[in-house]
Amino acid sequence: MSDETIPLGPINEGGASCGVGPWEGPVPEDPRYDPELLALGDRRNVEDHYRYWTMDAIREDLKRRSLPFEVAIENLGHDFNIGSIVRTANALGAARVHIVGRRRWNRRGAMVTDRYLEVDHVDSAQALADSCVSRGLVLVGVDNVPGSLPLESTELPRRACLVFGEESNGLSEEMIDLCECVVKISQRGSTRSMNVGHAAAIVMWEHARKLSAEQE
């Protein structure tokens, strides 16, 4: 049996079903393939090279290919942006995501990507800091508070845990105090800040770009 129910594929603008149908040709013997998906088709939101793979096989491959950074999100008020940040972390190769504070979070924006990525829960900012320090990671906050450093001119630690706050209030004071540094995205417009999901995507992409360049 597959690791998740195969839903009817969403319909795109051309009227065609997304995903792929049943496997055509000789059935592969590679254990990464899911017999049920091979027989019925794969409508999941996964990259083409993961089509027909089991969920466990995808998770293991993502662990192997992940970059040496993690992401943490303060969940103090059930922010709807958390799902979007988790999805971006999956797309850009984060090794792990931590939900800090409330255990329950809105998964809708994650588009099921949290099933393939290691997502855990920690009760507090201090618990996150303790976990990261014990594994050699450095907390790097992202917020436009006094004293924050411009992202474009700041060299981030390779093994950073990028920490994002809530849409309305940003990072908590406790979290800021625990961060090695806090970076901000330079802006030119009139708004004081951008959406936290968008800001997270920019910071993660920039850090992932530099880490990927080191591996080339």
Cite the ranges covered by each PLM segment.
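Post-transcriptional modification and biogenesis factors for structured RNAs
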Residues: 1-216
